[in-house]
Amino acid sequence: MKNLSSRRYTLKGTLALAATLIAGPCLAAAHAADYHLLNVSYDPTRELYSDINQAFPAFWSKTNSGDSVVVTSSHGGSGAQARSVLEGAPADVVTLGLAYDIDILAQNGLLATDWQKRLPHNSTPYTSTIVFLVRKGNPKNIHDWPDLIRDGIQVVTPNPKTSGGARWNYLAAWGWALHQPGGTEQSATTYLKALFAHVPVLDTGARGATNSFVQRGLGDVLIAWEDEALLASRDLGPDKFDIVVPPLTILAEPPVATVDRNVQEHGTEAVSRAYLDFLFSPEGQRIGARHYFRPVDPAIQAETAAVFPHTTTFDVASLGGWTRLQKAHFSDGGVFDQIYSH
């Protein structure tokens, strides 16, 4: 149909064109597609991706009129979610808590090993950081990492073997200890051992840990994603909790990727890529900011600057990178297994 104006028509061609025009609406309907995408995500993104999933179909239809898109999301601890995809969960996209969990999928052939180069900011549409959520009025006077190991303080944090957020929490504490004057891996290990002696129970995911703290009343302080702490404070009332941003903490970078093997099987490559592109769009960035994820778009950062307090951060690369850290700390027999005796 695009090149009709350049053709010379015979009577036969004219009749064929007429038939095509009459059938046009039927052909257009036949070419419309129904897409069903599965986003396998980590624990504290339920509300974020509920809104993203509702907004994305309109974004897709701007250039794909007539298509229908339904996106569903699955949530849990990031490590456990990655394992579910390895075991056959039909994810079109993964939006996990840390790059290592997606690297595992790449190492097993589910997507390309250079997946982080496909999208801006190492395929990270939003960032966060690690903060402390405390009871209103901060009755235990918790302001910084050393306060967490004082006598009588109970700390709530999830299990770093199953939760991406827990690994960020752990590494925030580890990195803080390393950055202290004279800090060494030995002194950081000593601090982590003292910290986890104050943890009465390990939930499997960040949302479970939040529920233990805010609903069950367990503990004096929750180590949490900034977005999770802000969400809890907003939804349960600022009269119940305060947020403490430690002077030094970690830059948390939760990345996203298409699962190449699955989207090729499902025929959803283009729509899955567009879904991830939407996260970087101004609309997607604003949705992220509404759910307290720090945007990466400078314009949206400027719009939302008042929401996010300034803090000094270090990143995972400065600690040696995920591959080294995973092996040293979170593999069987690693530092975490050595220090956690419960």
Model-based region annotation:
Residues 7-14:
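N-terminal export leaders
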Residues 21-30:
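C-terminal segment of classical bacterial N-terminal signal peptides
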Residues 32-162, 305, 340:
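N-terminal segment of the mature folded domain
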Residues 40-42, 134-136, 154-181, 195-199, ...:
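Short beta-strand->loop
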Residues 124-129, 191-196, 203-204, 236-269, ...:
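Periplasmic-binding protein-like
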Residues 137-143, 162, 175-183, 262-270:
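Short helix-loop capping/hinge motifs at secondary-structure junctions, enriched
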Residues 180-247:
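Ligand-binding pocket segment of bilobal, Venus flytrap-like solute-binding proteins
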Residues 263-342:
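Extracellular/periplasmic juxtamembrane helices and adjacent flexible linkers that interface
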